[in-house]
Amino acid sequence: MKNLNLKTQKFDRNLEGHVDSPFIEKNGLLEFNPKFIEPEFLTTWTFETHLYDEQVAIDHFVITFPSRAQLEKYAESFYPFGAQIVEGPDLFPINFCSTNINIPSDLWLHLMTLLMPAGGLVVLDAPHAAGDQKNRFQEERGLAAVHHIAIRVENVQNAATIWQNKNFKPMSDRALDYGSLTQWFLQNPAGQIIELIERHPGNNATFDCKNIAGLRLSEIAV
């Protein structure tokens, strides 16, 4: 976990109804638009878009790769465009968290985080073993699938009400908050996960190990 000088994201209230976005909605699920996950686009993108008829500020999103080698090759393409490596690549949780994080090895993954010039984070992950949870996700949804998108909000509880009205249900009894971030996974009937993330004033940590462990465990609890 690193504490970064992330930019404060503010909405452009004049954002057009149709904007270029890395995401495509299909039958309730999100997929990546291959035209807009290239470094030339993501390093100039504002991290604002529309999702499920809601204008949102994206804190981070996850791109999943078949292997760590492919993850690293993709990351290298960003270096000439001003993106910064802020974490990884390494194995989560054992090489990320100083405290003992007790999650089954089925939920471990290779992880890397890139900071874009606009202040948004692009998280890259890959299975750590054949047949693990991340590998099964890829086989079920395909490599274009979006595992989750994290929407930055001012108040997680208030935002959760908005998204529950869009038929996204919380995947755990409460939001996770171990002191640095407040985060909550919600999922719609199609199986798409969105994350609501509230960054506490003065804290711009990339993630909280206990929170992430809780989020990962919530995926197998539903």
Predicted features by range, described:
Residues 93-100:
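Long, acidic/serine-threonine-rich intrinsically disordered regions with weak helical/coil propensity
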Residues 176-178:
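A short beta-turn/loop motif at secondary-structure boundaries
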Residues 89-91:
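Solvent-exposed serine/threonine-rich low-complexity stretches and specific carbohydrate-binding patches
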Residues 1-87, 101-171, 180-222:
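Glyoxalase I/VOC metalloenzyme domain signal
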